[in-house]
């Protein structure tokens, strides 16, 4: 498993314990007490490092090469998944996957960004950066879900929409804007979960819903830290400072009222235990569907509208405003 810079002390101690256990198997000496001491030390070290992570540490975890993807969660949370392809205008975009599935026996539509697990797959999926046809495919599936009264679950995990010339020529901005407009008025429940990086408009194209959740170590921002640093300071190496300033973590966005709830992760990140992470997501999904049950279509749209109108409101209760 790939290690991140800030967690090297944990990895080194974990490896030392594993080596000692392996040596014990082939030795007549008893190292059980030494192993116990090291395991206690590891527990304290993990609590210290993972319990005091900086924003940049969370950015690294959100980008981890082994972090679970949309298809991983589909496999663990849903049954009878049938993937649908194509936008019926131009083509199919592998950077967004979507289809019909069952959640606890209930028909649902599942859509999400999909990055690759290796170089070959990343190239095929364009590193999880969708083209316009990806967003149009997603919208086609959303409208289909609305027609057949299926709830929609969106998994968000992208650095951003692909900014290439061909994507712009095929209407990248229009495709994203159309999704925002249409998702706001869907008459079926929409649940959005940021599972990795939530980058700019590319994330928003799947991010308008009745409930917005973020995994504990995911990020959600208008621009990448590197991009912000380049614009503000003409220096991409100041990405750490930009990450702090952007307020991109789940805790920041919960405090700002942008998201509804934080889904906890296993210590060290979701990639450490995908089964446990899927269980954590499942708990939230079950609770959310209970909250959404019995709500009429008109009330659903009204509550969604009110939700987004509250985001970004500024209180002037302690300030004087002079208008000339």
From Swiss-Prot:
SUPFAM superfamilies: ClpP/crotonase (SSF52096). This is Acetyl-coenzyme A carboxylase carboxyl transferase subunit alpha. It is an enzyme of class 2 (transferase). The lineage of its organism: Bacteria, Bacillati, Bacillota, Bacilli, Bacillales. It comes from Bacillus cytotoxicus (strain DSM 22905 / CIP 110041 / 391-98 / NVH 391-98). Its main location: cytoplasm. The keyword ATP-binding applies. HAMAP family: AcetylCoA_CT_alpha. It is found in: Cytoplasm. Pathway: Lipid metabolism; malonyl-CoA biosynthesis; malonyl-CoA from acetyl-CoA: step 1/1. Belongs to the AccA family. Disulfide bonds: none annotated. Acetyl-CoA carboxylase is a heterohexamer composed of biotin carboxyl carrier protein (AccB), biotin carboxylase (AccC) and two subunits each of ACCase subunit alpha (AccA) and ACCase subunit beta (AccD). Its EC number is 2.1.3.15. One of its GO terms (cellular component) is acetyl-CoA carboxylase complex. The keyword Transport does not apply. It catalyses: N(6)-carboxybiotinyl-L-lysyl-[protein] + acetyl-CoA = N(6)-biotinyl-L-lysyl-[protein] + malonyl-CoA. It holds the Pfam family ACCA. Component of the acetyl coenzyme A carboxylase (ACC) complex. First, biotin carboxylase catalyzes the carboxylation of biotin on its carrier protein (BCCP) and then the CO(2) group is transferred by the carboxyltransferase to acetyl-CoA to form malonyl-CoA. GO terms for biological process: fatty acid biosynthetic process; malonyl-CoA biosynthetic process.
